[in-house]
């Protein structure tokens, strides 16, 4: 989906927060305002056609509209079509990570991710933090090249689940947009 007339300062969190309940998001990209445009635009790709159709139907309905940060945005089908992938599967843009709380916390993980790949953050939730264990839920802007890259980087850098590893488990979590 192609979304126009977004607030100039739109964030991934506010954009994706307005898409809740539509379906798993595969990728999101925000284009900030540029020469001749005062508003931002975004591309949102869903994992499956049904989610894209549900979102497009909602956004096209004059009685509902698609509102982000108080502005009515215009949603159109993207001219570049994407094939459905992982239909009915468990891949998402959300990771749930458990492990040593010295590593599994907001500051350490976001700093570490920043050294491995570029990412956009929707939400970071600390589910548990004790002296012995940290558990967090990281909602990236996209599965493609963000949540997927984070999972691979963690698996390649740490012996996940092995004795002595600071990362005990990494799994895909529920996408709040689904």
PLM segments and residue spans:
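Conserved short beta-strand edge segments in small beta-sheet-based binding/regulatory domains
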Residues: 64-78, 158-177
């Amino acid at each position: 989906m192609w979304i126009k007339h977004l607030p100039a300062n739109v964030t991934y969190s506010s954009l994706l927060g307005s898409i809740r309940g539509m379906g798993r998001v595969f990728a999101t990209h925000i284009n900030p305002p540029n020469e001749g445009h005062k508003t931002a635009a975004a591309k949102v790709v869903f994992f499956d056609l049904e989610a894209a159709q549900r979102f497009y139907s909602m956004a096209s309905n004059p009685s509902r509209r698609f509102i982000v940060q108080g502005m009515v945005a215009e949603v159109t089908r993207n001219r570049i079509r994407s094939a459905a992938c992982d239909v009915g599967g468990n891949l998402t843009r959300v990771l749930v990570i458990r492990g040593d709380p010295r590593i599994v916390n907001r500051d350490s993980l976001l700093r570490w991710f920043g050294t491995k790949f570029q990412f956009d953050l929707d939400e970071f939730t600390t589910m548990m933090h004790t002296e012995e264990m940290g558990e967090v839920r990281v909602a990236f802007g996209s599965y493609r090249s963000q949540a997927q890259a984070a999972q691979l980087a963690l698996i390649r850098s740490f012996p996940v689940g092995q004795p002595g590893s600071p990362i005990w488990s990494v799994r895909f979590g529920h996408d709040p947009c689904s």
